[in-house]
Amino acid sequence: MWLALIPLAYAPILFAFIKEKPEDVEANENNETKNDFKASSIEGGFTLQQTLMSANFWFLSVMAFCTFYSILAMIGHVFLMLDGEGYSPQISATGVSIIFIGGFIGKVISGKLAEMIGRKIVLVGGVAMMLLGSLLIVSSIFYKNPLLIWIGLTLYGTGWGGLYTLIQLLVADLFGLIAIGKIMGVINVIDTIGGGLGPIITAVIYDSTQNYLM
């Protein structure tokens, strides 16, 4: 389980490098690059080609890859992990539902919070919730306490739901609306690859170690 969560732990590093808006990107580029990267606005923004040259795009894409890897690895294996640790099938199955309920809550409240305290803060908070949730889930195995499972899975799902929404908001903020459909399409391909690898790699790790806590 620890190895499966490594990509999630890497995600906060990315946020330190994400600029708040296109003007911040331009401030650090030379004059030639400035001519190519124009400030994003509601009426315009970056083209897909310009976006693919932006470090912000790749930071967001790697973050999306990591979070989808982690959430789908958790969804795919939480039942097996809890069942293998001696929890009843009812508790193990309920764990999956809690993740989705938390995800719904995160998606609903993250947009409002982003308007109140800023998108980047909410984004970092979402990752922190996922990390804290994963620690509580691991602790529940050692202490055999179902309450830790419920809290941990709720935090995990809520954090992911918030991240899912904030990625889309940040794309609009950073790159504008002129090519937002194409940009989100590329990011969705990347996060889908991460989501597809999550359950598979976690299964390979478990098969080789016979332990989710490695």
Go through each PLM region and give its residues.
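Symmetry-related core transmembrane helices of the 12-TM Major Facilitator Superfamily/SLC fold
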Residues: W2-A16, M214
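Flexible cytoplasmic inter-helical loops of multi-pass small-molecule transporters
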Residues: E20-G45
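Extracytoplasmic gate region of multi-pass secondary transporters
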Residues: Q49-K112, G198, T202
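Cytoplasmic membrane-interface "Motif A"-like loop-to-helix N-cap segments
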Residues: M116-V127
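C-terminal ends and interior cores of transmembrane alpha-helices
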Residues: A128-F142
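Paired small-residue
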Residues: K144-L155
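Intracellular juxtamembrane helix-capping segments at the cytosolic ends
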Residues: G162-F175
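A late C-terminal transmembrane helix in Major Facilitator Superfamily
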Residues: L174-T209
